[in-house]
Regions:
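Non-catalytic accessory segments of hydrolases
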Residues: 36, 40-217, 241, 385-387, ...
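Serine-hydrolase-like catalytic core of hydrolytic proteins
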Residues: 124-306, 363, 367-392, 457
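N-terminal secretory signal peptides
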Residues: 1-15, 22-23
Length: 564
């Protein structure tokens, strides 16, 4: 196991999330400090009158839920869509909630899936992102709803959080809050927590026998369960079950592409948006069974001892799982900006991700091909320019050249740096270095859009978010997750990252309108800003910036250097 691989096993959850999209620069570190205390979930409430009237009670098939009204928005947090997944339910498919008699108090966010929390991160990055880790439990199958009214029939926007398949939650970033979309864009906003890491993607099929056939993908079948809950109940919250859009960023985008290829999700999705993610690493069933066997061996357990595993403390489980994966996986030296190998003929790395089991998941969706099963679902897909922003990385040009040369050779590194400097003469070297991952992400967007187009069915729309934040002297650029503040219309809540400037507010209004229009109609255009579907010959792309515009394949000449 390489030193690089060993080091990666000890990364904080925030570093791991960002390294999945970064160049992997190891240059001079910025001052690091303990992350901010995570007991501030309610600190970002939009100003407005808050009340708990009897009118803020809605029906579900399991019983009534009581929410509150904040600034005119009916808000319900932590509604159960499944039972506790701990103990004997660990690695079993989600079970429907048990009915309740009195109104359920849907007043605070539900628990997150158990996960390794961050301990240290760059102070500046903590400031820009403003994370909230909340609290954790295996009783985490909960969803949140924001709606303008409990009557009517509005488009429904269901958001799946990022963090790969191991970290994150429905409320870890202030951008995830849905009141603004309900208040100003007349949609029903939903967000979801589900099982992650070893709790969501461990193959117990040969350990526990019957009933555990879907264990390796329960993190994904949880999401299907949440979408079924939406179909059965969202009408009681003013939503239209026939206009359900799913969307996600980073790992959430990969969840979206996986769902688009899952037979059990057919008919539950009517639009989809994939943001700075999608496709990616999906191991085979054989690989995941090998990993499970190694975990049992390392723990010193008999091969069929599911009972001990279900009683085991989670941190011990995840430590054993990570150690087993490190033993099985070959060292990865490709550079984080390109991610693990993917595409036809590639060999996936094992870990806590969905598995190609031939039942729940039977294809590498948007990797080998776009799924025929969802060909009639319009897709919106895009990325940001500085996907690789990691504030602790501050290279000189010479250091940057050395790093790139080690990954792609000196000739290509020289050509790439020269092309990026020419294309963006006003950007600092530090900001340009963050943009290499953005070019790689653009390549992936282009490929996924091409696969969708080749189905010759529903359209695909591309975007490229390039708005440069003015905060901290502007060096962070348009970082991984930056667009979320805008497509959720949350520049005020995210003012540490956006400055909530007049330019930011204007852009947010346009982007949130586009996302809401897409949810309603499958077309993100709006008056004065027509968004043309993409085709492989032209790569039509909406560029989101202070001057929003359509361009054919932006950054094409620069990004193609990566493919040469």
């Amino acid at each position: 196991m390489s030193a690089e691989s060993q080091d990666s096993m000890h990364l904080s959850r925030r570093e791991a999330m960002f390294l999945s999209a970064t160049v992997g620069m190891g240059f001079a570190m910025a001052t690091r400090a303990e992350a901010m205390d995570s007991t501030k979930t309610s600190a970002h409430q939009e100003p407005g009158n808050c009340s708990t009237p009897s009118s803020a009670i809605a029906n579900t098939q399991y019983g009534k839920v009581r929410g509150f009204v904040d600034g005119g928005v009916f808000t319900f947090k932590g509604i159960p869509y499944g039972q506790d997944t701990g103990g004997e339910n660990r690695w079993l498919p989600a079970k429907a909630p048990k009915p309740w008699k009195d109104p359920y108090p849907a007043l605070i966010y539900g628990a997150n899936c158990l996960q390794n929390l961050h301990n240290f991160t760059a102070i500046e990055q903590s400031f820009l992102q403003d994370w909230d880790d909340g609290y954790m439990s295996e009783d985490m199958l909960k969803l949140n709803i924001w709606t303008p009214s409990l009557t009517g029939s509005r488009a429904v926007m269901v958001y799946f959080h990022g963090g790969g398949y191991s970290f994150g939650s429905s409320y870890e970033l202030p951008s995830h809050e849905g009141a603004q979309m309900a208040r100003h864009h007349d949609v029903v906003q939903v967000s979801v927590n589900h099982r992650l890491n070893i709790l969501g993607f461990f193959d117990a099929s040969e350990i526990g026998g019957g009933g555990y056939e879907e264990s390796v993908n329960v993190g994904m079948t949880d999401l299907v369960a949440s979408l079924k809950w939406v179909q059965e109940n969202i009408g009681n919250f003013g939503g239209d079950p026939n206009k359900v859009m799913i969307y996600g960023q980073s790992g959430g985008g990969s969840k979206v592409t996986a769902l688009l290829g899952m037979p059990s999700a057919k008919g539950l999705i009517h639009r989809a948006s994939v943001q700075s993610g999608g496709g990616g690493n999906i191991p085979t069933g054989e690989q995941s069974r090998e990993l499970a066997s190694q975990v049992m061996k390392d723990l010193g357990l008999p091969p069929n001892d599911i009972a001990t595993l279900q009683k085991m403390e989670w941190s011990k489980l995840v430590a054993a799982g990570n150690a087993a994966a490190a033993k099985i996986n070959p060292p990865f030296r490709g550079g984080f900006m390109f991610g693990p190998p993917s595409g036809p003929g590639s060999v996936a790395r094992v870990g806590w991700t969905p598995t190609l089991d031939g039942h729940v998941i039977n294809m590498k969706s948007f990797d080998d091909a776009a799924p025929e099963i969802s060909k009639d679902v319009p897709v919106l897909i895009g990325s940001v320019s500085e996907e690789g922003m990691r504030y602790s990385s501050n290279p000189t040009e010479a250091e940057w050249h050395t790093q790139l040369s080690g990954m792609m050779g000196e000739t290509k590194a020289t050509a790439l740096i020269a092309a990026m400097k020419t294309a963006h003469p006003d950007k600092a070297i530090r900001t340009l270095s963050y943009g290499v991952a953005g070019l790689g992400s653009r390549n992936r967007v282009q490929n996924m859009a091409k696969l969708k187009y080749e189905l010759h069915a529903a359209p695909v729309y591309q975007y490229f978010f390039t708005w440069q934040s003015p905060m901290l002297d502007g060096v962070a650029g348009a970082w991984h997750t930056a667009e979320l503040a805008f497509c959720f219309d949350n520049t005020k809540r995210c003012e540490q990252g956006t400055g909530n400037t007049s330019e930011a507010q204007a852009l947010a209004k346009k982007m949130a309108t586009a996302w809401a229009n897409f949810a309603r109609t499958g077309n993100p255009s709006q008056p004065g800003l027509i968004w043309t579907p993409a085709d492989p010959d032209h790569g039509q792309t909406m560029v989101w910036d202070n001057r929003c515009r359509m361009e054919n394949d932006p950054e094409s000449e620069v990004r193609k250097i990566l493919l040469s």
